[in-house]
């Protein structure tokens, strides 16, 4: 049977049963019919779903179609979802962006890639977001160019792609964003992406980020310094133990333990008495990582901490130190 209103046709009885409601004058009826159509999980139903996404007069129906197409990666579906990123209704654009972010195949990514240079910033950012999850090497040049985009969301998604793909050639550009970008989230994302470095070339940028005016960036810098694994980061992390935000101090504690920075001993012992239990717990674990049995008296003094998670961490640290001492 051919639908008189479009060029789609089918002999599938389940789809045929739904056609009258798919063409109903009531948008609510059409939306429910679309849901039932998607439940069939039939590739043959895709033309009706994509038509609803691109042509239905109701934003509710278009948004529903965008959500229902999430699991499909046929080129025509992906292209329709990309086109829906330009829809006049924000709900439709958001649903299309979410469905695109669930794509898994490189073939789908190649359909998305041209949309990453669209004139509209939301389209560019959404396309880059979808490409990030796909780890499509073809997207690297586009992502590098997007690091200089005027829109912060686009820059942040570009950083994500380069980080996921571990593009070490982009490290100088990422370091500059980590230090100089005007947007907090871009600086934070770029700081995290510097963790892919295998040498100390990014340490100046990370140390600068550890003094950023926004604590979220400082927190990311403290974490990333531990991942880079350079002992020369120790003094900067030690200084971060006095940061005004406990979240930054906590990440600095973890990184100091990870680096086994011996000079952190006194600072970590002091934090065993901090009012925030998470800091006490992480400090105990870090002291265990340092491997200095001179921390045993301080750990034994807090083995009956009021917080069970702290007590557990203290026991782990004491066990580590005693094992090394034996």
Segments the model singles out, each with a brief description of its role:
Residues 303-326:
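Terminal, low-structured helical/coil segments at or just beyond the last alpha-helical repeat
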Residues 58-157, 161-164:
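A generic tandem-repeat structural signature
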Residues 1-32:
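N-terminal "cap/leader" segments of large eukaryotic alpha-helical scaffolds
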